[in-house]
Amino acid sequence: MKGAFVERDLSWMYFNHRILQEAEKKNVPILERMSFLGIYSNNLDEFFRVRMASLNRIALSKDKNIKQDRERAKKTIKEINHLNACYNKEFEKAVDDITEELEKQGIRLLHENELNEEQQLFIRRLYLEKLNGSTNPIWLSQVKEIGATGDDGIFLAVKRMEWHEDKKKPKVDYALISMPDKEMGRFVRLPKSDGMENIMYLDDVIRYCLPMIFIGEGKATYEAYSFKFTKDAEMEMDNDLNSGVMQKVAKGVKSRKSGEPIRVIYDDSMPKELLKRIMSRLNIDTLDTIVSGGRYQNHKDLMAFPDCGRDDLKYPKWTPILKPELETEQSILDTIRQKDRFIHVPYHSFNSFIRVLREAALSPDVKAINVTLYRLAKASKVVKALICAARNGKKVTVVIELLARFDEESNIKWSKRLQEAGVEVIFGVEGLKIHSKLVYISCKSGDIACIGTGNLHEGNAKVYTDYMMMTARPQIVREVKKVFEFISKPFKPVKFRELLVSPNEMKPKILRLISDEMRNAKEGLEAWIKVKINHITDEDVVAKLYEASQAGVKISILIRGNCSLVPGLPGISENISAVGIIDTYLEHSRILIFANGGNPKYYLGSADWMPRNLVNRIEVLTPVYDEELQHDLERTIDYGLRDTTNARIVDGRGTNAFQDGAPFRSQEQLYVDYLKESQEMNNVINK
């Protein structure tokens, strides 16, 4: 089936292009467009740190046993670089268009040579009060190589020309300045002029301040060019048997900071001699690694572009809705025992879930709390509630994944805090990331479980669309408890009747559910599959979906990211359609619905259809029996499939065409529905 499987990394590039498209849309508020540029750039940086680094390692490997993989990696790298070059041109044009439109709206970006006297005075004062001491140049003539200078930072390469009256040519020196953007932020608001808000890149602030930075070095003129380099994010894990898990991960994070440069982006107006010196100091000699760019790098900072108080240039805010039935004076744990409850963040407030943990921490009815944690907020209310529970005499067990990429240091910090408070901290199973989102609360009056699709992270809950189901159904709660037992004793065989749990049972059960739809289609029964998911790259699942399509099963997919499946191929996948939504919220929930001959089966949980989720992680999908939640899951998928404003057709070729039809924005309609339902429930409760 040639052309029926898309390489995951090419598919990812198509996904990220959908984000760039959102920045290009004229009907999107201008500051939101600026933010989408930042998101696009941030995604690309992480992609190069992780996926391109992995492909490069394979392509450069001397292992004779992976010749086929090596050739495939080289081919993929070439295709990605071609796509990236095309998308970069689009990106630069979008930056210019948005900057021009911003100026029409009264927000202007200034260069260092465009400042009036008041603004120059402001910049000089800023340098003396905040920047002085944070900008320490390194003379390239005095170093043989640029050492471990961190990752993903921006540098200014400075050409300094010192003039002497008795010489016709200046003495030329080159220096590097690491941008202090982590401390200062990337943008500086200047005093207004001509009724305009004025913004300046920190890069240009430093350009203006170069004579002050090099003061005492004699009369000179300066040129400065930005560049950045991205490093391989792979961690080298210590195999020392005497090291604990936490120590190994901490060493691994440290090794990442001195990883090999994967990509260097430089200002294309930089003199060749200066670029050559930088490449020499970085020990880079392959042209594939070097990418020319514009005046500014690290466009991910556009996510934090100053809004100057201009809410009119952003989408209206959707305030998270408090579900009235979860906000009564009644115990929330008792409310869950009456009926399955759920929240769908960010539409609903994450505080309802925090209330569950806080009540469990204080209630004398609660004996123990078990939780899986993958990523956590900086000031995590989840952790604070768990510490409170431990201090109130509950047995609290936390399974924390130390290898959550780029959150390793944060998770080490939280692990120590939890241990200091008397919480039992388990670091999971070697070789298996724990990605499931579970809570088990042991109570005298009846146990409770929470199963989610996303992280227990207050920050994520403001941006990522995720479900959290809270239940007291004994058959599900018992099995959630069994998952925690499996994590603590992973070599003990465990069977699950209700939950779909990887790495042992989830994949075969999903394949069986698809096969059941094929059988129903052949018997003339109702047969269809609706899926909302982040990624589909598992070859066995893709092949089974193709079989189902050929058997007459209609398959509708709402997908955010990687999609190796190609919908609409004659004789292969003509019964499969897929769309991807890019909007205010990041689509993150995983939902599966199978027609089951007219008696649909519903599932939600943490797993995508990728080998890593189905084989290399502990993931959990739960069946959903509550009719209200079933209706909500189906509505979410159906609205997404109908979306004509923010959904693109996923076709395996990266065309990302918009759907036809009357304007319909699924996220907006969901919020309107939830708001109406909340008001109606309030009326019922207050009668």
Which residues are covered by each model-predicted region?
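Hydrophobic alpha/beta core scaffold segments
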Residues: 554-558
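N-terminal localization/anchoring segments of enzymes in phospholipid and broader phosphate metabolism
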Residues: 1-529, 547, 551, 563-585, ...
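Glycine/threonine-rich ATP-lid/beta-loop region of ATP-binding domains
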Residues: 539-546
